[in-house]
């Protein structure tokens, strides 16, 4: 072994044989066990080691790490001679100061103890979070709390490719003694994620109480969105309340948290706790958003995004006496670098080419396991996003349980709901009266007196009721042979498959979701009746807006029917699945493994057309883009007024376009009807996985407060929007913040101006004027508080 002194930035690695392989280890000799020094702390500065551990818990560079034999935590001295071993006399001793051990945080090999053998670690699966581990968003002093970090999860036990999605978002702790009883008015649906329970105020802690002046709170939705002054006042008050609440959560003990051992239910009740205004820390989840996975690309753009996120954290911790102007704060956002079209196409092809299918054997042409790491950097976000987005738990709660000033303020939508909710609506496809005549949100109200077994039966009955059935029916009941013969697969997701067919001479989309079965579907557990019920009702509520009077729009995809069927997958659908797989490539498992008793939910939607992303080069002109923005803004504004709705995931894959012969499209907002030039296209909004809505005192939302992977994406403005939403609502996703709709409209406008090309160039004065208006819309829209505010006040829609 060479005896030269290491350079200042070099790292000492232990070698397990002589250089050039001239001398090999004796096969029968065991290595002596390594003993750590008794007192390591006296040799080092405690701040250096703590900083290293905070920077990356997964690294072995910490000199105080007892598990790293290369850095024993004390100055290097002469090695202890092993029994029977030889040490060359001419080998000089090395003296290495602790300063040389301050290495840059980066992924490194973890050396296992020699007595355990030197077998190579198995490669990570594509769905395994890659990159350095992150600290939990809660302060580390509460050792009894679970770490919400998704990357600490190990490999899935089931062995499926996406099987990790079930373990990524489940809590494994059991309730501690003395835990408060969960509130029955909150239903936590699913096993995918967890809702952090607020900690109670310690008995010995006394904080000064400050009363809030009711005059400073908005009295209606109009006042909440009418001007910048009221908006700033609302946000400052909400920020004060939330900082106190997060301070109370941090001050609790491990016994204050509510967890269930099965990971299915974790609930909180925050409104019954006494709110006191104090200097609370940052909200949960805010401390770790600045940590981003190492992608292997050290570029100025990445450093710029890190700096932008760091500035957001500094802004979030501004003292309460300092007022940050709302408009200036939003206009100074930093946009991450976007991928080129070539990069996006390459990533998509890699994703489709190298996905391991369930039950397939690896042949000589299969993707080699040792090359998984570069692929993980390419498709990590795509697969992780898919693995949890369709299996998010929906939180169903009462309005009083959501501590939001927006919620407690008098809402115009409350009176409108009572006026417009009890009328029969027309089926968009057939024109006949629909089987469901009014809202079904009341079905989500918790039944406090039911036991677990009765609750499960009740959920099944509710689903059957929405399907107008008494029990499951065969596939042939809703998909007769002539309908199946015309089926063509058009999409897929972790939830299942989407097919297109013809019903009554009209194209429709069929979405098939497996439920209540023991088999993993595409690596994830199947949904239950309890989990699928909110999905059905949300789709129905937004579809019903097409038949309302006071607030009406056809901008959300129409839901024609829902059925619960039982049986194995029909052969004609398998044939359509095979054709899609051979032409486009499928990332899903072939659905041929279901038994005869398998249950499915079959949702029939109107056919919405092609998504905006695929139409990026096919639109005629910027006038069409203006019509699309107008339709989207109007649809979101109507949903805000009627359902206090936030979409929260309106990327350009969730905007569908189809041709229409109508010259103008009609909508009604707060009783006032208006029209929009269609330019030959009708827009439909889809995918309500992350959405939030409220009706009849019931709030349904998706809690993503602990899902750090949602906020660490990179390479597109879309991922900045998730972080901006989190900053806007202080990571409290049950509250109503219509500004999130403005953020997504800004994202779509950005796409149209920078990543879409049009057949007709801006050569005429009229086209140039439209382009200037859209550019002005892009520059100024972040100063508006909601889609309703944009629609009514911005000059683009005048």
From Swiss-Prot:
Keywords: ATP-binding, Cell cycle, Chromatin regulator, Chromosome, Cytoplasm, Cytoskeleton, Kinase, Magnesium, Nucleotide-binding, Nucleus, Phosphoprotein, Serine/threonine-protein kinase, Transferase. Strongly expressed in testis. Also present in thymus and bone marrow and low levels observed in prostate, intestine, lung, spleen and lymph node. Expressed in fetal skin, liver, kidney and small intestine and also in proliferating but not non-proliferating cell lines. The active site is at residue 649. Changing residue 492 to A: Markedly reduced affinity for histone H3 and reduced histone H3 phosphorylation. Residues 59-70 have a biased composition (Acidic residues). Belongs to the protein kinase superfamily. Ser/Thr protein kinase family. Haspin subfamily. This is Serine/threonine-protein kinase haspin. It comes from Homo sapiens.
């Amino acid at each position: 072994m060479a005896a030269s002194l290491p350079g200042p930035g070099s790292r000492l690695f232990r070698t397990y044989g002589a250089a050039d392989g001239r001398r090999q280890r004796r096969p029968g000799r065991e290595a002596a066990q390594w003993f750590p020094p008794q007192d390591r702390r006296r040799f080092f500065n405690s701040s250096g080691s703590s900083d290293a551990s905070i920077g990356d818990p997964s690294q072995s560079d910490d000199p105080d790490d007892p598990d790293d034999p290369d850095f024993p935590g004390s100055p290097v001295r002469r090695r202890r001679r092993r029994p029977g071993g030889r040490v060359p006399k001419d080998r000089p001793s090395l003296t290495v100061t602790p300063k040389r051990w301050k290495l840059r945080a980066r992924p490194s090999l973890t050396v296992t103890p020699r007595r355990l053998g030197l077998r190579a670690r198995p490669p990570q699966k594509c769905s395994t979070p890659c990159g350095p581990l992150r600290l939990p968003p809660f302060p580390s002093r509460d050792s009894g709390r679970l770490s919400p970090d998704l990357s600490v999860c190990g490999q899935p036990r089931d062995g499926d490719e996406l099987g990790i999605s079930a373990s990524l978002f489940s809590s494994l702790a059991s309730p501690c003694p003395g835990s408060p009883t969960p509130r029955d008015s909150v239903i936590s649906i699913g096993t995918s994620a967890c809702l952090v329970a607020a900690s109670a105020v310690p008995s010995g802690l006394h904080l000064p109480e400050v009363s809030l002046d009711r005059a400073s709170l908005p009295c209606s939705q109009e006042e909440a969105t009418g001007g910048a002054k009221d908006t700033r006042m609302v946000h400052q008050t909400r920020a004060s309340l939330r900082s106190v609440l997060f301070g109370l959560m941090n001050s609790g003990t491990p016994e204050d948290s509510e967890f269930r051992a099965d990971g299915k239910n974790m609930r909180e009740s925050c409104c019954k706790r006494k709110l006191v205004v104090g200097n609370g820390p940052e909200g949960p989840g805010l401390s770790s958003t600045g940590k981003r996975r190492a992608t292997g690309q050290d570029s100025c753009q990445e450093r710029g995004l890190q700096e932008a996120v760091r500035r957001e954290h500094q802004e979030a911790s501004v003292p309460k006496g300092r007022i940050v102007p709302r408009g200036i704060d939003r206009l100074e956002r930093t946009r991450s670098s976007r991928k080129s079209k070539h990069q996006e196409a390459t990533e998509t092809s890699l994703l489709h080419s190298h996905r391991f299918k369930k039950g397939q054997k690896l042949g000589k042409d299969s993707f080699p396991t040792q090359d998984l790491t570069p692929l993980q950097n390419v498709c990590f976000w795509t697969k992780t996003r898919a693995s949890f987005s369709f299996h998010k738990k929906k939180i169903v709660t009462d309005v009083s349980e959501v501590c939001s000033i927006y919620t407690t303020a008098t809402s115009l939508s409350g009176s409108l709901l009572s006026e417009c909710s009890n009328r029969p609506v027309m089926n968009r496809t057939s024109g006949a009266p629909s089987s469901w005549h009014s809202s079904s949100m009341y079905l989500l109200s918790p039944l406090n007196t039911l036991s677990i077994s009765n609750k499960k039966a009740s959920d099944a009955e509710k689903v059957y009721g929405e399907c107008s059935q008494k029990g499951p029916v065969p596939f042939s009941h809703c998909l007769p042979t002539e309908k199946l013969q015309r089926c063509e697969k058009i999409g897929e997701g972790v939830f299942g498959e989407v097919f297109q067919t013809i019903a009554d001479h009209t194209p429709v989309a069929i979405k098939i979701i497996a439920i209540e079965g023991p088999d993993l579907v595409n690596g994830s557990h199947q949904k239950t009746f309890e989990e699928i019920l909110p999905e059905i009702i949300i789709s129905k509520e937004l579809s019903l807006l097409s038949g309302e009077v006071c607030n009406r729009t056809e901008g959300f995809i129409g839901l024609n029917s829902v059925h619960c069927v039982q049986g194995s997958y029909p052969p004609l659908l398998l044939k359509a699945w095979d054709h899609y797989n051979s032409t486009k490539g499928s990332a899903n498992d072939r659905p041929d493994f279901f038994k005869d008793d398998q249950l499915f939910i079959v949702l029939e939607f109107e056919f919405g057309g092609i998504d905006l992303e695929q139409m990026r080069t096919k639109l005629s002109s910027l006038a069409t883009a203006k019509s699309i923005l107008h339709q989207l803004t109007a649809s979101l504004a109507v949903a805000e007024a009627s359902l206090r709705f936030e979409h929260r995931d309106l990327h350009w894959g969730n905007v569908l376009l189809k041709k229409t012969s109508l010259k103008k499209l009609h909508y009604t907002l707060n009783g006032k009807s208006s029209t929009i030039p269609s330019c030959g296209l009708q827009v439909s909004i889809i995918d309500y996985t992350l959405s939030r809505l409220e009706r009849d005192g019931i709030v349904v939302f998706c809690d993503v407060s602990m899902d750090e992977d949602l906020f660490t994406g990179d390479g597109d403005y879309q991922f900045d929007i998730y972080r901006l939403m989190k900053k806007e609502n202080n990571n409290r996703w049950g509250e109503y913040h219509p500004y999130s709709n403005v953020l997504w409209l800004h994202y779509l406008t950005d796409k149209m101006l920078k990543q879409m090309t049009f057949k007709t160039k801006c050569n005429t004065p009229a086209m140039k004027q439209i382009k200037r208006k859209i550019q002005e819309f892009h520059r100024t829209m972040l100063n508006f508080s909601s889609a309703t505010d944009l629609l009514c006040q911005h000059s683009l829609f005048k």
